[in-house]
């Protein structure tokens, strides 16, 4: 079964994220459990936790259908020790918040070397950061998102994701989220069903579908291989509709949150309905 949704706002209370997801007929959703552009957040109260769990139960969202995202400020591969510790502490807090909310996944961008340390050292720091967070939490899987490779961000090659996973001690609590826009911008073609087959055969060979715990379904304003992260609405960008139809008809993408981060929230309900309909539509080769 496909879990299809969007990254919805939690403004006014975390429970509102589940309500907003239900309003667009989503069967999955993503959210921030705190302000994504601030380091510190007030601890979750029992009331906030209870309200969130009640809303999820009311609208039939299990932890497998929810993909929380951490703060954009966190850099788990930071080259400077003091800044690395700050990021690690913030990441542990994010994991603990998920734990409190009964959530089983936490999606995050791997990190950046900032042109100060080699890629390999940065990837090792990211893996070590994950190990530290996993030791201090229970039941939450660290879900590494592929990146477009803007600036000094790592994670734009499947090999980067594999290297991080290789350095994580508890393989049962690490996974990946593939963002279609990021993959395309990083040089993984998705414009035809044949290219989709090739790209995900590469993913299976290097990382493995066993680690796929979520997807971000975004078309791309950015050009193929541009290393620029610019999302677009489905079918309106440089990827086109075929990739998303193909994903909807491939059972390797069942049972994980498939999340829209497309640029127009006003049409998320339409995009979700379209994605659902593609499960039985004819694929044009």
UniProtKB/Swiss-Prot annotation:
Transmembrane residue ranges: none
UniProt-listed Enzyme Commission number(s): 3.1.21.2
Write down the Pfam families for this protein, in alphabetical order.
AP_endonuc_2
Sites binding Zn(2+) 2 sit at 145, 179, 216, 261
**Which Gene3D superfamilies does the record match to this protein?**
Divalent-metal-dependent TIM barrel enzymes
Keyword annotations: DNA damage, DNA repair, Endonuclease, Hydrolase, Metal-binding, Nuclease, Zinc
Cofactor: how and how many bound: Binds 3 Zn(2+) ions.
Q: Where does Zn(2+) 3 bind?
A: 182, 229, 231
Which residues participate in Zn(2+) 1 binding? 69, 109, 145
Q: Which cofactor does it need?
A: Zn(2+)
Listed PROSITE patterns: AP_NUCLEASE_F2_1, AP_NUCLEASE_F2_2, AP_NUCLEASE_F2_3, AP_NUCLEASE_F2_4
One GO molecular function term of this record is: DNA-(apurinic or apyrimidinic site) endonuclease activity
* Reaction catalysis annotation: Endonucleolytic cleavage to 5'-phosphooligonucleotide end-products
Q: Which GO terms describe its biological process?
A: base-excision repair
User: PANTHER family given for it?
Assistant: APURINIC-APYRIMIDINIC ENDONUCLEASE (PTHR21445:SF0), ENDONUCLEASE IV ENDODEOXYRIBONUCLEASE IV (PTHR21445)
Q: What does this protein do?
A: Endonuclease IV plays a role in DNA repair. It cleaves phosphodiester bonds at apurinic or apyrimidinic (AP) sites, generating a 3'-hydroxyl group and a 5'-terminal sugar phosphate.
Return the HAMAP family for the record: Nfo (MF_00152)
Family per similarity comment: Belongs to the AP endonuclease 2 family.
| Record's protein name | Probable endonuclease 4
Q: Which organism is it from?
A: Citrobacter koseri (strain ATCC BAA-895 / CDC 4225-83 / SGSC4696)
Taxonomic lineage per UniProt? Bacteria, Pseudomonadati, Pseudomonadota, Gammaproteobacteria, Enterobacterales
């Amino acid at each position: 079964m496909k879990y299809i949704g969007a990254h919805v706002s939690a403004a006014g209370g975390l429970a509102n994220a589940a309500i907003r997801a239900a309003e667009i007929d989503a069967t999955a959703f993503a959210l921030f459990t705190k302000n994504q552009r601030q380091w510190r957040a007030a601890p979750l109260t029992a009331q906030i936790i209870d309200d969130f769990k009640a809303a999820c139960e009311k609208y039939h969202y299990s932890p497998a259908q929810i993909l929380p995202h951490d703060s954009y400020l966190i850099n788990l591969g930071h080259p400077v020790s003091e800044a690395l510790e700050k990021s690690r502490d913030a990441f542990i807090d994010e994991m603990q918040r998920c734990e409190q909310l009964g959530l089983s996944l936490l999606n995050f961008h791997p990190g950046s070397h900032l042109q100060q340390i080699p890629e390999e050292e940065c990837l090792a720091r990211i893996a070590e950061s994950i190990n530290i967070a996993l030791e201090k939490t229970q039941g939450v899987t660290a879900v590494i998102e592929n990146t477009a490779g803007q600036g000094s961000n790592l994670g734009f090659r499947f090999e980067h994701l594999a290297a991080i996973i290789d350095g994580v001690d508890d393989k049962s609590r690490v996974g990946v989220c593939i963002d279609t826009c990021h993959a395309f911008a990083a040089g993984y073609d998705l414009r035809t069903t044949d290219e989709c087959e090739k790209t995900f055969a590469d993913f299976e060979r290097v990382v493995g579908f066993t680690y796929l715990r979520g997807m971000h379904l975004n078309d791309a304003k950015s050009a193929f291989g541009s290393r620029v992260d610019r999302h677009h609405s489905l079918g309106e960008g440089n990827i086109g509709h075929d990739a998303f139809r193909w994903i909807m008809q491939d059972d390797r993408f069942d049972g994980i949150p498939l999340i829209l981060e497309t640029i127009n929230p006003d049409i998320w309900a339409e995009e979700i309905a379209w994605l659902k309909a593609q499960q039985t539509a004819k694929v044009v080769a």
